[in-house]
Amino acid sequence: MMATAQSLEDQTLLAFAQLMEGGQEDDETCRELDALTKLLNDDYNASQANPQHQSICRVIDGDCVDTVLGYLDMRQPDAVRAHATLATSAYLKAAGQDGSKKLSAFFFDRVRRGTYDDYIVAFCVASAIFPVVPELSATLFLSEGFLGSLGPLMRREWKSRKVETACLEMLNTACMNPLCRDAVQKYCVDWLEEVVDQHPQGSGAASDAEPKVQGEGGSISMRRHSEQVQHLAAVILAKLRAVPSKPPHDGQPRPRVEPAVTSIQDLSAIFTKMILRDQDHGTQHSVEGLAYASLQPSVKESIIADTRLLHKLVKTLTLAPPRSPTTYGALSIFLNLTRYRPRLTDEETKMNQLKAYANATDGLPYLDPLDDDEHVCVRCQAVFDAGLVPVLVTHSKNGSPASLSLIVSIIHALAVTKSLRAPLAQQGAVKLLLAAWAMIPSTDEPSRRMAAQALARILISTNPALVFGGNRPTPINAAIRPLGSIVAPHATAETRDLLPTFEALMALTNLASLDDEETRRSIIKLCWPDVEEQVMSSNQLVAKAAVELVCNLVQAPEGVALYADATPQASTRIHILLALADADDTGIRSAAGGALASLTGYEPVLRSIVQRDRGVDIILGLCSDPDQGLRHRGVVALYNMVAADGEAGNLARDKVKRQGGVDVLKDCLKQSHNPDVVQTAAEALKALLAEQTS
């Protein structure tokens, strides 16, 4: 065991020695970093499994840490930096507290030295580790005096723009942390404004002046900053504008209007100008900035109004590599453009009104009319017309879970518009949603439910036969499990939203309407308990949709068996159907009547109806209903009962006659104009009168 530990330590030191040598090809460097990453990950796993394990981190000193962190320098190739980030992450996980101490010492030592190279490496390291160890990174970032020193630093003349760029990259990454974002707002916003506000080439005086020596002070507005630096500063300002800081804790009210040199609209214009260029340089930062700026309704409207920009954003997403920052940023823009306000229940609406009255001194909460449903609907149409959906389909095949979640959210919003549902299906949205539902981790329940609901919306408004089957590789049964997953309301949601339930039931009803017993059989197998529960829903629309689905399901033998197997459960189900056939809502009565019309041809169902006190009365009530459709369902059910053979038929005919069925059928014949109703009622009456004369 000791020999193995010694061997691992030797391998670790050898890996660091080769990394320290330098001068290697990038591929060799990446391989060495990967080898180190594996050693560290294995070491961490061994420590977790055995507390007595001697970690290889004990041979990793400050020089070793400096070596790995040096490969995070922005002047290194992107591939090397990516592999170095993985190695750094593995080291910090394996080394624990000691690793955090060494990293902190490295950062503060480099900042204290204050040379050109030291600043670049320190800022690059801070940027790289923020997503890896956010708490440690925030501690470094918020250390006393650090942020305050950045203003004077940006006023110095350097031999290149890399110090400025590295500094702004660090600030940009740090804005993911609320405390760091507030600190940037407090200490850096003034000079960030100056950087953004100046002309890229600076003023005439600055252009003609001799370059200042390193360390000389002066106004930032008199420095000449590159476009890249300006755009980075603009992205940071966009994040500060889009995500408001927390109110002060000292009890002092925040000013209603905070002074700002550069508005969010100005920043949006900067990003738009950069994106519309034919150059790729700066696109990533501009897309990221516009993603934050487009949280504002006015910016959303300006993007939609600029057809050229909208198409360029679609093209940018088309060309962006999978899992890249540009892909995520572009998807975020389209999500912001298409996102509807959350649906509020009546209770939530009343609660918000009460809160508004309680806080009347601060003014009522403002809901921008540019973000109402009408404006969002127009934006969704514009985004669809720009050709976004095929690009989303392509990106969904190779995207990260985070990107896939954004794609699903966009399709979900587009599917709100009924006129877009069939085109969405034609452009591949159904296959996208089915794949997404299967790929999204079960831990991301909101995204999975959103994918299922978007699928339901599309399948409500399209002919399933045109979406599935034939030469299409996707079988219709692939949609049943996702739809079934949202029939039951979300168990852990704070509010009870029945819209997904309703839409799923409608979509399943559409699938069950096909002449395909296998589809009905699958729905019963996968969804029946939840469907049956919704039959008794207190929401009339949900109950109606559930009973309509039942009406289609009982066309299959498995559906009939649920009501006609002569068990107590089946009898209870018939009792519920009879009660629904007597409901106040016409739609519920119609769906229940349709199910009874199909089921009354089976003896156990017939007996169950006859044995109920009001069973026959309810069927006769359907025959007397003013609605011709309901009347037709009633006379079909009644005919099945009185035309039945054997003892069950005799019982049915006897009770129907005793309940005044002959007169009901005569009145039905007089008042009906539908030939099907007249013919069926006449046959039922004939069956009753034939027995009476025999």
Predicted regions and their residues:
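Alpha-solenoid helical repeat scaffolds
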Residues: 3-11, 35-38, 54-77, 83-118, ...
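Buried hydrophobic core positions in alpha-solenoid tandem helical repeats
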Residues: 15-19, 67-72, 103-111, 149-154, ...
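Alpha-helical solenoid repeat architecture
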Residues: 30-50, 70, 79-95, 120-135, ...
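Acidic, Ser/Thr- and Gly/Pro-rich intrinsically disordered linkers and low-complexity segments
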Residues: 15, 197-226, 265, 317-326, ...
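Acidic, serine/threonine- and proline-enriched intrinsically disordered linkers and terminal tails
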Residues: 331-391
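Short inter-helical turns and helix N-cap capping residues of alpha-solenoid HEAT/ARM repeat scaffolds
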Residues: 25, 76-77, 114-115, 157-160, ...
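Long amphipathic alpha-helical scaffold regions
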Residues: 11-262, 272
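Short sequence/structural elements of tandem HEAT/ARM alpha-solenoid repeats
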Residues: 50, 54-63, 97-105, 139-145, ...
